[in-house]
Amino acid sequence: VGEGEYALVELCTKIEGKQDITSTQNMWIKQDGKIYKNGIRKPVDLDELPFQDWTIFEPRRFYKPMGGKISMTGTFEMNRGCPYSCRFCSDYGLNKLYANNGGYYREKSIKRLIDEMKEKKERYNLEFAYLVAESFLTTKRERIAEFIELYKEVDIPFWIEARPESINEENIKLLESSGCEGISLGIESGNMELRRNLLGRNMNDETILKAFSLLEKSSLRVSANNIIGFPTETRENIFETIEFNRKINVPGVMVSLYNPYKGTALREYCDEEGLMRKDAHAGDYRSETVLNMPQISREELLNLQKIFPLYVKFPKSEWPRIEKCEGDGQEAEALYEELSREYTEKYL
């Protein structure tokens, strides 16, 4: 329950010392048929955490497709949490959990971040960096300026994520001057009513369209994040999201499957509507959905996720061919492989 760094250390220390573990904070522990629901300790000071230990991973784990090629990539936490509380996101539950305990959102100092990035670059010959920040630009301007100045000591391309509301010409110029190579923006749904009322993302279509239009004129690589499979969402709604992506003409198209994280408002809705087992855990957003919805089947969702980028990028004259990929059998799979090769050659 909550953060695990100090909780795990405390648990292991108690087990090693053969001490009672039932009072370990940030954990609910079942022992002898009784459940001990312990409280939440104060949020971790990110600057106090040690540098990541990458020696436990095989080197091949760090080679990732970033910036249009496979690069030795390091992932670095810039802040933890999010000042927003979208109803489908795990940060919704974490913000609620820590509301009376200092709040969940916090930022790592820029100097601490840069020190770790420099150490990892020198030790592992990093070629690329991915910054973990729910929205890179949703912070004080002074903090961004400090990062840009100190990042000169790291000097490798990096990728960020941001919200459409934070994109303007001034921020784009800052990013271009900093060594930022790419940026991902969350669309999530192309249906504005669903986006606002169900997801809690209070932004209109014009805001999103303007953000992508400004980025299209920049030197930054751009991708759009989408999610399908929300409760109440229909096939028609999903195609609204496809059409919205076609309108912005973004180079990179990412699509995930909605999964109901515990503690979120949308999970509560799914439970109330009987869309899932009460004891079900959220699945892998890249390949699984745990919802059983009357308006669209699991199989249809999985197929639409697979061919979503094809619908976005190919001309509509190809849509009948793409739709055939939704079928079962070898013929549908062979056609999907053929179209995927064409997609790679034309659009990647």
Regions from the PLM with identified roles:
Residues F136, G190-R195, L199-G200, F212-N237, ...:
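Conserved strand-turn element in the central/C-terminal portion of the radical SAM core barrel
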Residues Q52-S223, E243:
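Radical SAM [4Fe-4S] cluster-binding motif and immediate context
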Residues V1-K42, L257-N259, G263:
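Glycine-rich beta-alpha loop elements in corrinoid/cobalamin-binding modules
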Residues A265, K278-D279, G283-L348:
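Radical SAM enzyme core and accessory elements
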Residues N171, P231-R246:
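Catalytic cores of alpha/beta
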Residues I183, E273-A282:
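Flexible glycine/proline-rich, aromatic-decorated loop/lid segments
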Residues I144, I238, R267-E268:
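Histidine/acidic-residue-rich catalytic or RNA/ligand-binding cores of hydrolases
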